[in-house]
Design a protein with these regions (language model features):
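A short helix->loop->beta-strand "cap" motif at the edges of active sites that frequently abuts
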Residues: 120-124
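Histidine-centered active-site loop/cap adjacent to the catalytic His
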Residues: 60, 64, 70, 180-207
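Conserved SGNH/GDSL esterase-like catalytic core that processes O-acyl groups on lipids
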Residues: 2-111, 147-150
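Substrate-gating cap/lid alpha-helix
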Residues: 133-169
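Hydrophobic positions in alpha-helices of CheY-like receiver
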Residues: 112-116
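Surface-exposed, active-site-proximal loop segments in enzymatic domains
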Residues: 90-99, 134-141, 179-182
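Mobile beta-alpha loop/short-helix "lid" or hinge segments that flank ligand
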Residues: 87, 129-134, 167-176
Length: 207
């Protein structure tokens, strides 16, 4: 049985035979930069993304096949750029434990990569590290720290195999001051544009 439909003329995402086809997966941070990435890569690439917040690693695992079936031909996707981390690392409602343990996170990243390889067989895979928290120490309802994020990023990178590329968005945002943040973890409009430009540059390097 095929993992996805081979060709779907009525699919929401119609792949181009001329341009690069890029699929962005991620949480609200991705939602904040995806429009800039699309603008920066035009006209060289078509940039696709679901409107949904892709939440945590478990959510990505359970929805990847559905998203793949939104493409006219998933085998024509050239690049899949993904991140999930903020939801996994968060201590929901201030609980003692993060949503996803370190061991579970590493396992889930491996599962996601394996699924991308099956569902998008010709795509280069880029893993984006999770971005930093507001350095002013603002505590959200679902807290996490930059130190925790750094640790989970290291765990994720250790799970990568083969030719998976790392786009280190943690490094991009690590020296940003609190003026770049709209709240405890989300960025201002201008900062999201800068993040989108950084993502676009990382994608261009794989063209």
């Amino acid at each position: 049985m095929a993992y996805v439909e081979n060709c779907n003329a009525n699919a929401q995402f119609q792949c181009s035979e001329i341009q690069k086809n890029v699929f962005l997966i991620g949480d609200s941070i991705r939602q904040g930069y995806c429009a800039t990435v699309k603008e920066e890569l035009s006209p060289d690439a078509q940039v696709f993304y679901v409107s949904d917040n892709c939440r945590n690693t478990q959510y990505v695992i359970t929805n990847l096949k559905t998203w793949a079936n939104m493409f006219s031909n998933p085998s024509m996707v050239d690049i899949v750029h993904f991140n999930c981390g903020h939801w996994d690392i968060a201590h929901w409602c201030g609980g003692e434990l993060p949503l996803t343990s370190e061991q579970e996170y590493k396992r889930n990243i491996k599962i996601i990569i394996d699924m991308i390889r099956k569902l998008f067989p010709n795509a280069k895979i880029i893993f984006a590290t999770t971005t930093t928290m507001n350095p002013n120490g603002t505590i959200g309802i679902n807290p996490r720290t930059t130190a925790e994020i750094a640790r989970y990023n290291d765990i994720a990178v250790s799970a990568l195999e083969g030719d998976v590329v790392v786009n280190d968005l943690f490094a991009v945002t690590n020296d940003w001051d609190s003026d770049c943040y709209a709240d405890y973890c989300h960025f201002t409009t201008d900062a999201f544009k800068e993040l989108g430009k950084a993502v676009a540059e990382a994608l261009k390097k794989t063209f």
